[in-house]
Amino acid sequence: TEMISAKGLIYKSPGTAELFATCPEDGPVVVQLFGSEAPFMEAAAGQLRDKGFVWFDCNMGCSVPKVARTGSGAAMCKDIDNALAVAEALIRAAGRGRVGFKLRLGWDEPGRSPAAETWRVLAPALEALGAGWLTLHPRTAKQGFTGTARWEYLSELKALVSLPVIASGDLFTAEDGVRCLAETGVDTVMYARGALRDPAIFKAHLDLLAGREPEVADVATLLARIREHARLARELSTEKVALLKMRTIVPRYIRHIEGSKQLRADIIACRSWDDFEKALHTFEAGKSSSE
């Protein structure tokens, strides 16, 4: 799921419930929680278990300022004792082996912060507590998404623990993901920004692993995918929320199409579903006439 605030869930903040809304086809679903207070995290996991959720992921890697300012996300590496107290509470609520943890390398580089390379302390401690798996984005929190993900740390983590290790960071294409598997020995990868740019990245990944050449979507296929995405968004959400999401998502995965600058602008400016379809149709007609 998207990141869900444990406190927001307990206090029933507007919109929180929609973040873990799902359907049978989604299974198995892993609920991604964040928060820096053990009682709230334990209570949130307990509530979600009562709703039938089984798997959880604790985000200790998000470096977005509004999350880190609360002591959550990547800021948890600044207080190892509290991070482990939160982990213990979550595992107590969900069960051993049912909670994963996302980590960064640390808050900053050695010499710049006392919370440097905290992953080396957290990883084995989380394994001892009963974590089910670990995900590492091999950048510091201060880096955000700048610089280059240092995949060599993924190999080190894999050697340090016996848990499944998931790689994150600079996985923009399926080829990146498969190369990361080969170079680091991790168990699998987690696509984030790469999936926002190309929703078909997961199928392409499986194709490459199976020795098949991934399909390269032409414009007609991509537009059909956008319309299907819009249909599902409207079916699974309110009309207003679905349109807002499509206005945010679609421009990312049409960016590589030649001549799509105006389409991106038109999608972002949409105020209704009629506007949305008109933008697609105008672009489609323009492409057809130029071929």
PLM regions and their residue ranges:
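Flavin-dependent oxidoreductase catalytic cores
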Residues: 1-291
